[in-house]
Amino acid sequence: VEILKYFKKKKGVYFNKKGWYLIGCEMPIQITPIKTYSNVVFVGYLDIVMYHEPTNTIKIIDIKTSKTTWNKKKKNDKGVRSQLILYKYFFSKLYDFPIENIEIEFFIVKRKLYENCDFVQKRIQIFVPPSGKTSINFSLKIVNDFIKRCFEPNGKIIEQHYKKNISEWSCRFCPWKFDEVNCPKNPKLLKLLKIA
């Protein structure tokens, strides 16, 4: 409720009405990333899509909630950034809209404010990830590699053991992080499960 009150009061700061038109909310996109894998479809729902008529620009906004604002680590997480970058790329392909005229941004809504704080806190943080050619190619490679590794061209799932992508971040809430025997990072356990 507090978030909505804050947003109603400050909406003009985040959304300018002049020349902007709302294209859609929760706008679905469906596309086949690799033509030879016609049964493997990328599906996404774009939270907010807006059009700026004077500059012929589309803006895709992805709303995220967070306990606090995003730190440097979260902003640099290429997996998180890839979602919006792929939305930009596939929107361009699907609607034949110039990719250089598509902007993307994360609209991060902060759930918690610090008590007894000496400075004014904002409930909303805007983060615009880099989305040039290099970022697009990186994100496409992730998706294409995943499709080729996990699916046959007819769309059938390739049954096999897949190596876990374990990072220090995933250990944070793991129930076995202090259990040497059951820890997924334990090399002996990985060898036993044949996923190392």
Label each PLM-derived region with a short phrase:
Residues V1-W70, D96-E100:
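Catalytic cores of nuclease domains that cleave nucleic-acid phosphodiester backbones
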Residues K72-S82:
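Short alpha-helix boundary/capping segments
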Residues S82-F90:
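Short amphipathic alpha-helical face segments that pack within enzyme cores
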